[in-house]
Amino acid sequence: MNGALGNSSASVSGGEGAGGPAPFLVKTYEMVDDSSTDQIVSWSANNNSFIVWNHAEFSRLLLPTYFKHNNFSSFIRQLNTYGFRKIDPERWEFLNDDFIKDQKHLLKNIHRRKPIHSHSHPPASSTDQERAVLQEQMDKLSREKAAIEAKLLKFKQQKVVAKHQFEEMTEHVDDMENRQKKLLNFLETAIRNPTFVKNFGKKVEQLDISAYNKKRRLPEVEQSKPPSEDSHLDNSSGSSRRESGNIFHQNFSNKLRLELSPADSDMNMVSHSIQSSNEEGASPKGILSGGDPNTTLTKREGLPFAPEALELADTGTCPRRLLLNDNTRVETLQQRLTSSEETDGSFSCHLNLTLASAPLPDKTASQIAKTTLKSQELNFNSIETSASEKNRGRQEIAVGGSQANAAPPARVNDVFWEQFLTERPGSSDNEEASSTYRGNPYEEQEEKRNGSMMLRNTKNIEQLTL
């Protein structure tokens, strides 16, 4: 048996050198063709296949002798590699078309099959694709990690800055609280000091806060009601209006009394013209009870206006007037003039106060009194003689009151008015007062109204000039 194995080995080596069949095929052919091992492996009845009868003994005895291993499964895989196939499912019978008994030369036609990598290549390609996908995902995750780390670093820096700002704000708030506490402590200490309170009160009293509390009076047009014979007062205005009118009448009566005193005989007499506005639709700033804007202007500017010479003229009634009958006497008017601060009514007629820029001649107290009484007598004589004309004039005023505002009448040149309104060279104080008086827009409107009244009262004016 050893000699047979030696011969087979020599033939195999010779076949390999001459390019014969594969050593596995030669060894298998010799192992099957050995008759001494027919109980383990032998040819089939057709001599074109071989049968392994006992695979356990085959693995234990024959495989280590020919192939140096005892793995039956590995032997079967090798058979499959060279094209052998199992033909009987019940036993281990293998067949190859060129593996036939007594035809050993056909073994050179059996070739080893090339390994088919159809099953191995797809896993390799899929592995590469998966590896590429995984690598791409890893790169993406790395980029996201870097961005997150940058944001985290930025947030840490912002946290440090915010913490610093918070500390500064806390210090600032603490400083403000300390200042407030110090201020409150100082105020408590100062209030307890009577000297400080006294000095503070003096400072407050010295402050001129009247300018902040002043309110400008808006023009208010009062609608006068037709006077009745039974009534003596026109109560169209309210209580506040009456109080201001009473105060003004008191001041006006005091001025009138001072003019008649001898102490004021040497002072310049300046007169203002105050006319009624209810019957002609004028602003209440020019009426007697509401206050003269020129008088207010001279009071604010502090011009040294002297007490004025007063003349009585029948130019209309005031907004709040006392009704006089045609048989009213001079004594009744004088009594009302002297007691105007005690009564709530106004004069039955306006006092025309005209401004003279030049100083009037010096008169004694007796001359002033005589002149005033003479003017009063002349005025009331004119009132008695022109009672009917006044009634007619009131009706015309009531009908044409709106026309006076729409088309102001032309100014009438008269010798009596020109001697007072014409500017004369005189003292600088009177010139300053005259310029201030002429620059007032209320005076221009009143002059226009004076012109319309002068047209209706020309006869009375002529009597006054006599």
Swiss-Prot record:
Entry GO MF terms: DNA-binding transcription factor activity; sequence-specific DNA binding
One GO cellular component term: nucleus
A UniProt-annotated Pfam family: HSF_DNA-bind
Q: Does the keyword Transcription regulation apply?
A: yes
Q: Please state the protein's primary subcellular location.
A: cytoplasm
Where's the motif Bipartite nuclear localization signal?
198-217
Record-linked PROSITE patterns: HSF_DOMAIN
Q: Please, which domain of life does this record's source organism belong to?
A: Eukaryota
Tell me where it resides.
Answer: Cytoplasm; Nucleus
Ranges where the record places region Hydrophobic repeat HR-A/B: 125-191
Positions with biased composition (Basic and acidic residues): 218-233
Q: Where is region (Disordered) located?
A: 215-248, 272-300, 422-466
Query: Which positions does the record tag as DNA-binding?
Result: 21-115
Which InterPro entries would you find in this protein's record? Answer: HSF_DNA-bd, WH-like_DNA-bd_sf, WH_DNA-bd_sf
Which residues fall in a compositionally biased region of kind Polar residues? 425-438, 455-466
The record's annotation in SUPFAM superfamilies points to: Winged helix' DNA-binding domain (SSF46785)
Entry keywords, A to Z: Activator, Cytoplasm, DNA-binding, Nucleus, Phosphoprotein, Stress response, Transcription, Transcription regulation
Role played: Transcriptional activator that specifically binds DNA sequence 5'-AGAAnnTTCT-3' known as heat shock promoter elements (HSE).
In Swiss-Prot or TrEMBL terms, this protein is called Heat stress transcription factor A-5
Q: Which organism is it from?
A: Arabidopsis thaliana
Its lineage reads: Eukaryota, Viridiplantae, Streptophyta, Embryophyta, Tracheophyta
Q: Which gene encodes it?
A: HSFA5
